[in-house]
């Protein structure tokens, strides 16, 4: 063998050893399985976070996997736990909270971090988010993609109708008046629509008007004897008005979940109520000039309260080898970092869920440059409607908060909530189609939902 060939052989062997070393190191990484329900650009952002974590260390490999819709992901996770093959982490939407709390399948994130000696400042999470997922003073799931419904409006349609494009309506009477002007000017085919009808028009309308959605402190005081209260005076007033507006296109019902989104994106409806998480998607898909505002209010005698959250948190499931849970804890620690929350907010439109992240965004003039993304924070937390940083160079007095947090706006904790939401939306559809009166529809929704609540209580007796 010539010297040249010998050298080539040595180099080849050395390179082979390096490749084997890299492969072995990669193979030694402990996999952390993470089931989620994200799609499109949101799924891309979730995958990017996991890749960044994976590249930051050599011990763990987070493996995200979409399992379907929120409801399908929840069902799949519970089934996998019962079959003793659960993922380490699962993303569960807010209506699954009571189910998860009483499932016996979860490790509270507070306990997980304590067991792994990882310090998290639990008090730094913003109260409306943390409060939704706490039990007995402990945070049970890690806040992740939290949102709240806000008001979107077409500025071009406002201009065509002679309305001020920088002043969205603040009251429901304003919404009606603006809609009629828009229709009269042929600026749009309908005044407004909504996504997620139960979440926006029933759950959040009760919260923002300081009205109870259910008894027993909206379910926070236990599962026994909880009943829905949405067929009372306020529920009948609000849903009744929507049904009346439906007749003359002031309001146009567009279906459940996000099926009404095209009504706004196409310009058919000039105003729209949907999750704050759609800001990123609308920025890419909407071709006209648009803005955001807070949810409309009916005014006196109702108090103007903060809104409640939607979105989801990350739950840690039991049933995996104990040594693997340190990797779960490390990933949750990574996601809790202010810089990760800030990037997640900017890239997706979901809320940054810690006070530190929100403060950093404010001090960096992010909300001044991106006022659309400030709306949700103001409405959810009771912050002034104008970013404080925007007023620093002005002589005018700083704006005062317009909303207050109340027990009725802290959230909802109900068993079988996924099914209850379906019941409510089915009856809303009957009302909007004229098949039932408002009272008949809401009474039926309450009766059916109370049956589901009783079933849940019976199945979860201590």
Description of each model-found segment:
Residues 278-288, 299-423, 460-462:
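C-terminal lobe and pocket-closing loops
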Residues 110-125, 168, 211-237, 284-285, ...:
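Short, solvent-exposed loop/beta-turn-alpha elements that line the ligand-binding surface or hinge
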């Amino acid at each position: 063998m010539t010297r040249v060939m010998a050298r080539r052989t040595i180099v080849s062997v050395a390179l082979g050893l390096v490749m084997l070393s890299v492969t072995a190191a990669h193979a030694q990484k402990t996999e952390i399985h993470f089931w989620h329900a994200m799609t499109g650009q949101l799924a891309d952002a979730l995958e990017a976070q996991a890749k960044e974590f994976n590249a930051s260390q050599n011990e763990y490999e987070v493996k995200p996997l979409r399992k379907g819709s929120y409801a399908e992901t929840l069902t799949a996770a519970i089934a996998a736990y019962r079959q003793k093959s659960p993922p380490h982490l699962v993303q569960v939407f807010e209506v699954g909270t009571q189910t998860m709390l009483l499932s016996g399948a979860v490790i509270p994130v507070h306990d997980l971090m304590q067991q792994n000696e990882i310090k998290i400042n639990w008090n730094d999470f913003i109260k409306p988010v943390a409060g939704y997922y706490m039990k007995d003073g402990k945070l049970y799931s890690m806040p992740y993609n939290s949102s709240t419904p806000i008001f979107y409006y077409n500025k071009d349609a406002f201009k065509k109708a002679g309305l001020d494009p920088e002043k969205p309506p603040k009251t429901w009477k304003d919404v009606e008046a603006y809609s009629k002007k828009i229709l009269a000017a042929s600026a749009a085919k309908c005044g407004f629509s909504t996504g997620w009808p139960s979440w926006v028009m029933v759950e959040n309308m009760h919260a923002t008007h300081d009205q109870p959605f259910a008894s027993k402190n909206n379910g926070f005081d236990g599962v026994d004897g909880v009943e829905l209260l949405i067929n009372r005076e306020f529920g009948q007033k609000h849903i009744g008005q929507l049904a009346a507006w439906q007749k003359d296109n002031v309001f146009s019902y567009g279906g459940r979940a996000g099926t009404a989104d095209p009504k706004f994106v196409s310009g058919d409806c000039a105003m729209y109520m949907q999750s704050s998480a759609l800001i990123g998607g609308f920025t890419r898909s909407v071709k006209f000039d648009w803005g955001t505002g807070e949810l409309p209010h009916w005014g006196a005698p109702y108090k103007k309260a903060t809104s409640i959250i939607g979105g989801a948190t990350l739950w840690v499931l039991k049933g995996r080898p104990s040594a693997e849970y340190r990797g779960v804890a490390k990933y949750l620690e990574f996601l809790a970092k202010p810089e990760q929350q800030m990037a997640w907010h900017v890239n997706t439109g979901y809320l940054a869920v810690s006070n530190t992240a929100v403060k950093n965004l404010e001090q960096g003039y992010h909300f001044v440059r991106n006022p659309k993304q400030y709306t949700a924070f103001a409405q959810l937390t009771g912050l002034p409607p104008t970013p404080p940083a925007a007023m620093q160079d002005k002589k005018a007095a700083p704006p005062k908060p317009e909303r207050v947090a109340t027990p009725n706006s802290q959230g909802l904790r109900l068993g079988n909530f996924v099914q209850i939401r379906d019941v409510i939306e089915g009856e809303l559809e009957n009302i909007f189609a004229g098949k039932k009166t408002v009272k008949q529809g809401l009474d039926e929704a309450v009766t059916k939902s109370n049956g589901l609540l009783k079933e849940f209580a019976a199945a979860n007796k201590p």
